Curated annotation (Swiss-Prot):
Entry keyword set: Glycoprotein, Membrane, Transmembrane, Transmembrane helix, Transport
Stretches with biased composition (Basic and acidic residues): 18-32
Organism from which the protein derives: Aspergillus oryzae (Yellow koji mold)
Glycosylation: residue positions: 48, 90, 252
Gene: cpaT
Protein's UniProt name: MFS transporter cpaT
Pfam families the UniProt entry points to: MFS_1
Amino acid sequence: MGHQEEPPRICKTPSGHEQGEGPAEKTSKPSTEEVGWDGPTDPARPVNWSRKKKWWNMGIISYLTFLTPLTSSIVAPAQGLVMKDFHSTNRTLASFVVSIYLVGFAVGPLFLAPLSEIYGRLRVYQVGTFIFTIWNIAGAVAPNVGALLVFRLFAGISGSGPVTLGAGSVADMFARQERGVAMSLYGLGPLLGPVIGPIAGGYLSQAQGWRWVFWLLAIVSGVAVILVLFVLSESYEPVLLRQKAKRIRRENSSVEVNAGQALKLDSRKVFIQAITRPTKLLFLTPNVALFSLYTGVVFGYLYLLFTTVTEVYETTYHFSQGATGLVYIGIGVGALIGISCFGALSDKIQNILIARNNGQAEPEFRLPPLIPGSFLIPIGLFWYGWSTQMHIHWIMPIIGLGWVGCGMIATLLPIQAYLVDAFGEYAASAIAANTVVRSIVGAFLPLAGPSMYATLGLGWGNSLLGFVALGLLPVPVVFYFYGKKIRMNSRYQVSV
């Protein structure tokens, strides 16, 4: 968000009298003020907020980025109950009850990211969370599977805001050298949420029925509505400057005020530019395209596991529905280990590289943890696949899932931090493009899971996934060593 640049200033355009054109007349135009921040330490600027205010806001955003991904998987252990209740035995349709939510996650960012540039991040968080709550209530009373699919789709659209805008909010509030911990907290939700979801959903649906899964979601999202309405603050600088300009106009109507040339675009033009920006970045910039593909594969694997682990443990290890949810703890523990290792290393490694680079920061300095981290997901898939294929003790596949969880953190955190640093003011658009791709793959790859495992078995099926993941290893290596040259290449300078 330009935190490294000189902050905006208030510039006054003098009247004719001030320019030495003779005495001022009563009909002379009033002076014009261009509104900016009151110096580099202006406390109204989000990057200068108190530590307490920053982390209150960060905590709420992290809660949202935990809650909305949790909703994607919480119904996974209850797929059988849902289909039984609606008298269907279609396994692909059962998987789609889970994954259609991610179709909404793919559609939502295309609209919510540009709307945040017009109305601010806060308004999108508020309206989106309220509508998200409504769709969860609708899911609890769904009369048939078709209606449930529609409600899940719209819940995904309205719930995609926090994941799309969260990285931009981090960039708003934290200087580049301080973002590592905040990005780790933001990035933890999209991984821990889907892991904890099946644990809660398994026992709750077994005890109270699958509809109570949606009532629980409605309750916890209702709490989120209260937080975003009464505690969360706006952090998007252009919107804050527009608000400041309006406030000055009200207090002194004799002074013409604007919030900078870049902020005077009409809403329609801003919306069109912002809605096309993620598409341009996705198709015209190699870093966004390849890292979006990378995260798409990772999320596709995650949701493929979510939709198949339940059946594997019920049929192979004879777990109850509630106990099956506990299997996902393996991914959660792995994710926590990944956070403690890779989250802590992110800022340290970057600071070392900055010092070696004569104090000059580069986005590519976020990528070193991704290189060793790229081996973890293949290790986990081989471990999980062959453990289940050979019917080895049930703890062994869970350990394999732990490797997968750790690898996902090691993959997603550096990529998100890299995109935020590389695109600055347009970080939300880069993350939106990334979210669209990973959500589409996450929605549709699980549909191929049952037929793939039926043909190849759990061992070779998961090995195939592992080999594909290994094939992506050159991506972070290439961008670490040549990323700046690629970014500076005029062929990839996109007008956004």
